[in-house]
């Protein structure tokens, strides 16, 4: 086991604080509408330019082990805020730094670290309750656009495109962000349920100009097995021929004689039919077939539940308004399933998302939920260069997370105003002693830090701006974008309540632990040339390093 270096008391805290300040100072320059960019060196490819706090934090590793511990703990604040709310990483870092700086001053002055931490915790609990009281629901498209615009560093085009996407696919819909090919941002919306399986034979194509299959008002047959014998399909096909309606077959596979017969019948115009493989594999395929069944009002024909394909009737089939099949995708539009059953299925999947511990499973479940609930929107980010593309894509992703958080828990006045107003209401939190009272004061001072940093980044005097805002009331605050004061809600400067809440809670949690640190332990770095010198008869090899 390698030898360790141990530092105690004030020496430990000073070195830890140095690391906190290095990381926080690099991150906080990005805060607010006039925040600056940070350039990150990459081992391959061009440097990355970003205004995303967590991206900056993740890049920072310090040479001094003890300083690095401080930096890593603040990095944890940014990462936690990013995981929970998807945004607010810079705010969380600024809050954490403010609490640590003031807290360590108090510890150096002889106050009890544990009481300081308890005071900070009490203030944060009271602040979270006040934030919830201050919060307003984010219901309309205009508010959604405003939240997205603020999170995307005042880029209105991003705000508008996210609001449009949310309007089209609903709150449960999936919105993904991709790198586009054009100079402008583009929005593609896939309505209905789409899965990544194309037609099993090009002979099903009935729209040669687009190379696709289009079926109007088709029946949908769902089978959880391979179909190779045409005899199994005959009862369904005979019943179908009488109705004159087309048929979509979704099965594990359709092959051999069965596929050949379907192709021949389709080409002769006897029965209009198309077959595709079922999406997914294993248990996920069963679940997705059931999703399609509920969406179309049909039944999955599966032998394990006692249903045989030969005995299936038209009543077991689902129906839809339209189906479009390309060589890669199948889209079912306006399935005729019962809305109550679809809603029940969506809430069931939502429950599974909450219980799942795997990020991959969560993502797949959310995709299924979106396909049932509304659809999928793809925002294609456009830019002139790859460097700009990456920076813009990160901002779009942040804005998207912030918007979801706003829909979930509502919005509060932005620009750091919400925390200033909350701080003024919780000054008289009950405490047991003077040290705890000072802990509350530390938290209240820290709550001004985001507003002060926004003002500093805008080139203004932070104390003047903070006092002007504190002397106001309600939603009155400072708009750094155009250097004016006024009602933040009327000016459209909104922050998601969840983002502000998570930033405060995570910052206080980790900063409180740092204040109570009394000793730090780290490995003593070993000299590489000394390591080589220990090899018998090869002492001279040290110079080769």
Curated annotation (Swiss-Prot):
GO cellular component terms attached to this protein's record: cytoplasm
InterPro entries given in the database record: Chaperonin_Cpn60_CS, Cpn60/GroEL, Cpn60/GroEL/TCP-1, GroEL-like_apical_dom_sf, GROEL-like_equatorial_sf, TCP-1-like_intermed_sf
Keyword ATP-binding recorded: yes
GO biological process, one term: protein refolding
Catalytic reactions on record: ATP + H2O + a folded polypeptide = ADP + phosphate + an unfolded polypeptide
Quaternary structure annotation from Swiss-Prot or TrEMBL: Forms a cylinder of 14 subunits composed of two heptameric rings stacked back-to-back. Interacts with the co-chaperonin GroES.
UniProt protein name: Chaperonin GroEL
């Amino acid at each position: 086991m390698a030898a360790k270096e141990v530092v105690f008391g004030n020496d430990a805290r000073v070195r830890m604080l140095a690391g906190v300040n290095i990381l926080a100072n690099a991150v906080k320059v990005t805060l607010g509408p006039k925040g600056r960019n940070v350039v990150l060196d990459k081992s391959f490819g061009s440097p990355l330019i970003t205004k995303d706090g967590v991206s900056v934090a993740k890049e920072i590793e310090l040479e001094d082990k003890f300083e690095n511990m401080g930096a890593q703990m603040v990095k944890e604040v940014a990462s936690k805020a990013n995981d929970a709310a998807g945004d607010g990483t810079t705010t969380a870092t600024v809050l954490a730094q403010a609490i640590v700086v003031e807290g360590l001053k108090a510890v150096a002055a002889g106050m009890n670290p544990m009481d300081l931490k308890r005071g900070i915790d009490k203030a944060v609990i009271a602040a979270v309750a006040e934030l919830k009281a201050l919060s307003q629901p984010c219901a309309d498209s205009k508010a959604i656009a405003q939240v997205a615009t603020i999170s995307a560093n005042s880029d209105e085009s991003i705000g508008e495109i996210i609001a449009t996407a949310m309007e089209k696919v609903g709150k449960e819909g999936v919105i993904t962000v991709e790198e586009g090919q054009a100079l402008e941002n583009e929005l593609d919306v896939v309505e209905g349920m789409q899965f990544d399986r194309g037609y099993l034979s090009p002979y099903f194509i009935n729209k040669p100009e687009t190379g696709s299959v289009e079926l109007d008002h088709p029946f949908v047959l769902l089978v959880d097995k391979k179909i190779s014998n045409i005899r199994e399909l005959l009862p369904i096909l005979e019943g179908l021929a009488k109705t004159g309606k087309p048929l979509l077959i979704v099965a594990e596979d359709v092959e051999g004689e069965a596929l050949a017969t379907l192709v021949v019948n389709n080409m002769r115009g006897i029965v209009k039919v198309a077959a595709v493989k079922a999406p997914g594999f294993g248990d996920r395929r069963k679940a997705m077939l059931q999703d399609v069944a509920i969406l179309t009002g049909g039944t999955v024909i599966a032998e394990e539940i006692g249903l045989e394909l030969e005995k299936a009737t038209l009543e077991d089939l689902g129906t839809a308004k339209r189906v479009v099949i390309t060589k890669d995708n199948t889209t079912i539009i306006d399935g005729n399933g019962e809305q109550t059953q679809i809603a029940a299925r969506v809430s069931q999947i939502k429950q599974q998302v909450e219980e799942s511990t795997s990020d991959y499973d969560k993502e797949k479940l959310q995709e299924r939920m979106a396909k049932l609930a509304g659809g999928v929107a793809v925002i294609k980010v456009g830019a002139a260069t790859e460097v700009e593309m990456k920076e813009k894509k990160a901002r779009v992703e942040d804005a998207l997370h912030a918007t979801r958080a706003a829909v979930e828990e509502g919005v509060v006045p932005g620009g750091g105003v919400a925390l200033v107003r909350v701080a003024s209401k919780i000054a008289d939190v009950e405490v047991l002693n003077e040290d705890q009272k000072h802990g509350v004061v530390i938290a209240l001072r820290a709550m001004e830090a985001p507003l002060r940093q926004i003002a500093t980044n805008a080139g203004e005097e932070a104390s003047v701006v903070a006092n002007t805002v504190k002397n106001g009331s309600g939603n009155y605050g400072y708009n750094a974008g155009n250097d004016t004061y006024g009602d933040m809600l009327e000016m459209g400067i909104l922050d998601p309540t969840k983002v502000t809440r998570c930033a405060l809670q995570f910052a206080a949690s980790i900063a409180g632990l740092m204040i109570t640190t009394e000793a730090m332990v780290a490995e003593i770095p070993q000299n590489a040339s000394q390591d080589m010198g220990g090899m018998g008869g090869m002492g001279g090899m040290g110079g080769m390093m």
